[in-house]
């Protein structure tokens, strides 16, 4: 079954088309132009002032990458040297500077989610931003809230935060603030509904033997889009994100980087996005269509990697000269790019890139792939780590979730013989960076694989850190790190005072195949014989502690309730300080306060199967129908009355907490008013000129395959090299696509993140929390709301806070619920509304431990 339209879903019921119909994404034109609203005003005006001085070719130069593997960064635009504007360096990844050296390898986004700590999210973002800035990168290609985590086995879930949109949204926003406060443009990605690696790109899928010709299509209804997948991006826009990266997949059978509904309507018109939309690498599929649908920057610039051809560059210049793309659209692209640059203060901090993404050699050709240009110093080996190892270690410890503890932890340091068991305890025999883009599972797992990685400056393994602890106390430590040497594992476990067993499960981006996992995991089991390693140790040692390093949930049902398994910890993907972070928790220097950012089911079937791994549409685009709507992770478990092993939000401590005294207070707030009125007409800046103004400059030494904005000839058809050049634009351009007249403001729009009235605080909720144990510890009070409708989740997370309490001390935690927190999306009015269904609020320590509840008063 396939959805007929993103708007064709009633508020309380999904309307499905017949099986032979494909989902359809309705057109929305024209592409909204930036207006500098809110705190963008100063940056917008500066951008207008500089863009007004640019020629058409100079504007185009800002919009188009110069080509894959040509300049130093993984993506680099042209600049405007005449006006002192450099080409902009865009660099991966969401957890650190990729393809570089002397940089930090931070914990992954999923670990930040496990901290439930807004301040740590900000500090991590700020620290990463500092390192990107110091390396000469202007744009960080992160953070990610797409994938959100529709399927627990989605390959890149770990790059983002959590399948809960509220938790993801808050930490997404804080990360963006941190990055941009360090003077680097943050890129909110991957927009949108990019939830699996299978079929994300047709050429990649063809390489794996799948006979498809188009990327897979994520098919979802408007309610699901707004209440789940768009939610964290609204938080990102409200936080001032300078860039948004559109994704590889199609959304309702329209590619993410030329989908006018998701880019023009949702992102720019409804959420009021003022920055620029950048394509993911090779996700740009059409020149004019992409420009008019809201794409602002093409990366890495070429049609295919290293092809030397581009949908934009020269072709965008031609499209403006012949009137196919209006001047106001390319002006808007340039203004958006420059406004983001100015908003973060990049002009004050700019430094040229001091590293090469393509080689670690000190010297090389300036234009790497074609071995052209001067032979010069391309790597300056600048150490940008500062003191970030301290923060990384803290986040690693504060994100370690204690899932089970039968009195085994914390360790006392007096254990006479400690057994370290499992490959995940030790080093990769090829070195921490021995597998390209971490594309293997050898040794301890501290990040997944793909473009969302960074080189480790070092990696402290659990074996190193724990051995240091044991030897410091003059006790014995022995290792068994061959996961198939079961006899040796059993023999060692028999002699141990405590057996620490290390297991893992990996995943990553689809261009790398690890043990038959094409990015997405094939299943949720532990890798490399992990279950048998645990059972071998536990059958011979009555004090077996299991440590899991994984990209998400794994199946623990075979051994979690074994009485000899006395403790279980999830360490996630903790980055370079992995072993030290874990030792801090094991030995009680840090009291665990982390909470699971996802649900641990008893079986893979408990999650339902949302991952499409076989083509289902002939050789056309595989159709990925999001038939579950908003019911993913704990929402789906609740709906199906499925009992998890460990619920969303669950996590133990070395102390205990008590919740009491829930109070609810209605706050004074303005009435909700749908936004109304019209925009100004699209402004233009400067003159376009004639084709003769944009011929290649005399004396230019052209670089092979480099993407330029200039023309070979004043004959535009000859300059384009397009066999279909001259086709009447009215034959293929949607109605209104080039209309620069004033446009109506959407009811749900009018401000950053949507209608400003959505963020009015309507209700204050307070709870008393007491530390009833004997040691200080962190707790994360969680506030859930029931929206009351018959087809709504039983509860949805809305607020949380990580707090520290000394023993026997208590505090009153107070938070507020906004209009958005209490509203549903109405597909008929195309606006948010607080329904008349009775609503309740719940408070507690996890999604299934909510001792306090109260009815909410009626608000509007």
Swiss-Prot record:
Q: What pathway is this protein a component of?
A: Glycan metabolism; cellulose degradation
Q: Gene3D superfamilies under this entry?
A: Glycoside hydrolase family 3 C-terminal domain (3.40.50.1700), Glycoside hydrolase, family 3, N-terminal domain (3.20.20.300), Immunoglobulins (2.60.40.10)
The record's listing under InterPro entries reads: Cellulose_deg_GH3, Fn3-like, Glyco_hydro_3_AS, Glyco_hydro_3_C, Glyco_hydro_3_C_sf, Glyco_hydro_3_N, Glyco_hydro_3_N_sf, Glycoside_hydrolase_SF
Q: What GO MF terms are annotated?
A: beta-glucosidase activity; glucosidase activity
Family the UniProt entry places it in: Belongs to the glycosyl hydrolase 3 family.
Protein purpose = Beta-glucosidases are one of a number of cellulolytic enzymes involved in the degradation of cellulosic biomass. Catalyzes the last step releasing glucose from the inhibitory cellobiose.
User: Can you name this protein?
Assistant: Probable beta-glucosidase A
State the organism named in the record: Aspergillus niger (strain ATCC MYA-4892 / CBS 513.88 / FGSC A1513)
């Amino acid at each position: 079954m396939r959805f007929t339209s993103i708007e064709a879903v009633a508020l309380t019921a999904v309307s499905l088309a017949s099986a032979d119909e494909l989902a359809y994404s309705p057109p929305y034109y024209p592409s909204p132009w930036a207006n500098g609203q809110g705190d963008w005003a100063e940056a917008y005006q500066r951008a207008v002032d500089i863009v007004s001085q640019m020629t058409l070719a100079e504007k185009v130069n800002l919009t188009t990458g110069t080509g894959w593997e040509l300049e130093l960064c993984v993506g680099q635009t042209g600049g405007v040297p005449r006006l002192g504007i450099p080409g902009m360096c865009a660099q991966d990844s969401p957890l650190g500077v990729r393809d570089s050296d002397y940089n930090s390898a931070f914990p992954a986004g999923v670990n930040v989610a496990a901290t439930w700590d807004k301040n740590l999210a900000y500090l991590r973002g700020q620290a990463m931003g500092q390192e990107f800035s110091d390396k000469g990168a202007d744009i960080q290609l992160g953070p990610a809230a797409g994938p959100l985590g529709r399927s627990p086995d989605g390959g890149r879930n770990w790059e983002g935060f959590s399948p809960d949109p509220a938790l993801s949204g808050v930490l997404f926003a804080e990360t963006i603030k941190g990055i941009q406060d360090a003077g680097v443009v943050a890129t909110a990605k991957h927009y949108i509904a990019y939830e699996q690696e299978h079929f994300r790109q047709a050429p990649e899928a063809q390489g794996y033997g799948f006979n498809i010709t188009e990327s897979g299509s994520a098919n979802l209804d408007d309610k699901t889009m707004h209440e789940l997948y768009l939610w964290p991006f609204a938080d990102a826009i409200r936080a001032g994100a300078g860039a948004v990266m559109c994704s590889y997949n199609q959304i309702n059978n329209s590619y993410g980087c030329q989908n006018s509904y998701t880019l023009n309507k949702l992102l720019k018109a409804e959420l009021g996005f003022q920055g620029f939309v950048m394509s993911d690498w090779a996700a740009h599929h059409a020149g004019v269509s992409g420009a008019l649908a809201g794409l602002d920057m093409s990366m890495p610039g070429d049609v295919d990697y290293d092809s030397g051809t581009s949908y934009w560059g020269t072709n965008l210049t031609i499209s403006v000269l012949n009137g196919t793309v209006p001047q106001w659209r390319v002006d808007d692209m340039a203004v958006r790019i420059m406004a983001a640059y100015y908003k973060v203060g990049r002009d004050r901090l700019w430094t040229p890139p001091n590293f090469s993404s393509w080689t670690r050699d000190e010297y090389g050709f300036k234009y790497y792939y074609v071995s052209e240009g001067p032979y010069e110093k391309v790597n300056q080996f600048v150490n940008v780590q500062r003191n970030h190892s301290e923060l990384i270690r803290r986040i690693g410890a504060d994100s370690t979730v204690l899932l089970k503890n039968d009195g085994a932890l914390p360790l006392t340091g007096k254990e006479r013989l400690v057994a370290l068991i499992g490959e995940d305890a030790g080093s990769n025999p090829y070195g921490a960076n021995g597998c390209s883009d971490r594309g293997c599972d050898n040794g301890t797992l501290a990040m997944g694989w793909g473009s969302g990685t960074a080189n480790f400056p070092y990696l402290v393994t659990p074996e190193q850190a724990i051995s240091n602890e044991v030897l410091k106390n003059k006790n014995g430590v022995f290792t068994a790190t061959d996961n198939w040497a079961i006899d040796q594992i059993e023999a060692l476990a028999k002699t141990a005072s405590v057996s620490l067993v290390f297991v893992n499960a990996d995943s990553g981006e689809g261009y790398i195949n690890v043990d038959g996992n094409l990015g997405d995991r094939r299943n949720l089991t532990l890798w490399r014989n992990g279950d048998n390693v645990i059972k071998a140790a536990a059958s011979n040692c009555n004090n077996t502690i299991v440590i899991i390093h994984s990209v998400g949930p794994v199946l623990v049902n075979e051994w979690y309730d074994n009485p000899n398994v006395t403790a279980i910890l999830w360490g996630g993907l903790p980055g370079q300080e992995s072993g030290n972070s874990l030792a801090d928790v094991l030995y009680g220097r840090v009291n665990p306060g982390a909470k699971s950012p996802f649900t641990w089911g008893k079986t893979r079937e408990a999650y339902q199967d949302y991952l499409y791994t076989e083509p289902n549409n002939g050789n056309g685009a595989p159709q990925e129908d999001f038939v579950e709507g908003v019911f993913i992770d704990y929402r789906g478990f609740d709906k199906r009355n499925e009992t998890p092993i460990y619920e969303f939000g669950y996590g133990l401590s070395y102390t205990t907490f008590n919740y009491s005294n829930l109070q609810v207070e209605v706050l004074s707030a303005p009435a909700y008013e749908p936004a109304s009125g019209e925009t100004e007409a699209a402004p233009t800046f400067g003159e376009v000129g004639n084709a003769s103004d944009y011929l290649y400059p005399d004396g230019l030494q052209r670089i092979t395959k480099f993407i330029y904005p200039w023309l070979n000839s004043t004959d535009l058809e000859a300059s384009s090299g397009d066999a279909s050049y001259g086709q009447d634009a009215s034959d293929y351009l949607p109605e209104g696509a080039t209309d620069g007249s004033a446009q109506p403001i959407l009811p749900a729009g009018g401000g950053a993140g949507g209608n400003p009235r959505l963020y009015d605080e309507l209700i204050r909720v307070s709870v008393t929390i007491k530390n009833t144990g004997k040691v200080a510890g962190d707790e994360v009070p969680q506030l859930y709301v029931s929206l009351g409708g018959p087809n709504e989740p039983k509860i949805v997370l809305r607020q949380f806070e990580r707090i520290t309490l000394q023993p026997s001390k208590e505090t009153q935690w107070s938070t507020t619920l906004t209009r958005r927190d209490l509203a549903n999306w109405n597909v008929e009015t195309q606006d948010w509304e607080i329904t008349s269904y009775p609503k309740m609020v719940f408070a507690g320590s996890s999604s299934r431990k909510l001792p306090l509840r109260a009815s909410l008063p009626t608000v509007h």
